[in-house]
Amino acid sequence: MILYNIFLVKMKVDFINTVFPSSTKEYIPGTIYNNIKVGMRKIHFNDNTESILVYDTGGLHTDQNVEVDINHGITKLRLNWIIDRQDVEYYERQPVLNSEHIFTSQSNKVLRANSTKPVTQIFYARNNIITPEMEYIAIRENSLRQKILSYKPTVMSPEITPEFVRQEVASGRAIIPANINHPESEPMIIGKNFLVKINANIGNSVVSSNIEEEVQKMIHAITYGADTVMDLSTGNNIHDIREWIIRNSPVPIGTVPIYQALNKVNGVVGDLNFNVFKETLIEQAEQGVDYFTIHAGVLKNYISHTDNRLTGIVSRGGAIMAHWCTIHNKENFLYTNFEEICDIMKRYDIAFSLGDGLRPGSIADANDTAQFLELKTLGELTDIAWQHDCQAMIEGPGHVPMHLIKENMEKQIHFCKEAPFYTLGPLTTDIAPGYDHITSAIGAAITGWYGTSMLCYVTPKEHLGLPNIQDVKDGVIAYKIAAHAADLAKGNPSAYIRDYALSYARFNFKWHDQFNLSLDPETARSLHDESLPSEHAKSAHFCSMCGPKFCSMKLTHHLKEHSTG
């Protein structure tokens, strides 16, 4: 099967030029490793006097000069780095049931550790090794830090070095999701001392979507700024959808393996067992999944604490494991077999995303006993993961009113020893179906300010249906706003410069620059042009809100002219 190539060269260039006009891709070389080239987006000012570099998650999909054929996937950027470490070996991947093997360019040979030693970034970091991935990240994160000092000297540390990246990973305060079987991924970092990241969830269901649509969703998500993508498919062709996504993704891909494991036993929860789950883990490890959500903190004795909740257990993975524990009257097999799971993870460098299966699903249930019992257990599991040189981050809620968000962050830091926190929102009110990308972005900005490292987006379709491509874009933009607002509040200099540049353009009526510096130039331009569509209006010193006589900025310019005589 050959999919329609979504972005043929001209279509792709037209799309990128529409989404990000006056932008080009620029590659910054490494200094420790001479084979590193970090792709950034350069936004050119309309008068061509200046430009700024911004973090770009789109990989080759946002490079107008590169043709991407999604039927063959993107360049394996990290493959030589992985092979050069001489701690991996090729072997024949295990056969996969119910897979059409339609991604014909993918070899049956995959990588794993060639000894009992881990091949994880945390293992290298603890052994004082600065990997190419770490230098790549330092270049990405360090963008504009020196430049901003001339504007605003009282900001965070002026430079992020590869050594600083290594230290943060070694301590467990940050993770680099980078499966050795996903060499297409461009290294990124999740940790509170770095830019706040966002995740976009995609995936089919039994009633909607197909492979091509999910690949399109992924490309749209990363084009607009998603730092990672989770494939939460629960319908048909789960394995094949994931193969297409991974082979075309420059960002880390996460999954919830229990979904595919349940699919293998025809949806009968009682038929699940650790052997089925383990087989699924290895299949996905061989494909290149970069992080797994594992709901190992849903313990049998915690389930009764959800009985009096308004909305019970709302996590799909949490509900599956709670149901399994109740049917068999046994402890969660993800918990009892956790160390064996660690052994699998460290052979491929897959990061744990320790799932919050008992997260609150309504404001009424926020910060209750069940939620915090599980969080304490996730902290204990983090210690075990670290003992095995596995990377780990902690998932968080959910639905939490604004005044209770800080308590979540404080308890997570206490129980989980500063492992990165990764939250779904949280939604700050339950009364706005259709607008939950807004209700949750409010909570996301607050928790990001308090120290959450990655924000899982919520789309307008939350609680209503499966998101389409427009919903994905709306969710990503809402969460880019939240993450950027958090970065500003934390004093991250890489965030400040873009605000400064856009405000300068706004005050000086540089309309094209104002559009192009925004997160969504196409929307900004279209809203302006609804009432003032002519090109002449792009040089006018007013918009349709105030008109030429009541524009405060125009009047301020007159004041300045008067005061300078």
UniProtKB/Swiss-Prot annotation:
InterPro entries the UniProt entry points to:
ThiC (IPR037509), ThiC-associated_dom (IPR025747), ThiC/Bza_core_dom (IPR038521), ThiC/BzaA/B (IPR002817)
Q: Which reaction does it catalyse?
A: 5-amino-1-(5-phospho-beta-D-ribosyl)imidazole + S-adenosyl-L-methionine = 4-amino-2-methyl-5-(phosphooxymethyl)pyrimidine + CO + 5'-deoxyadenosine + formate + L-methionine + 3 H(+)
Give GO cellular component annotations, separated by semicolons: cytosol
Major enzyme class: lyase
Gene Ontology BP, a term: thiamine diphosphate biosynthetic process
Query: What is this protein for, i.e. what is its function?
Result: Catalyzes the synthesis of the hydroxymethylpyrimidine phosphate (HMP-P) moiety of thiamine from aminoimidazole ribotide (AIR) in a radical S-adenosyl-L-methionine (SAM)-dependent reaction.
This protein is called: Phosphomethylpyrimidine synthase
- Organism source for this protein? Ehrlichia canis (strain Jake)
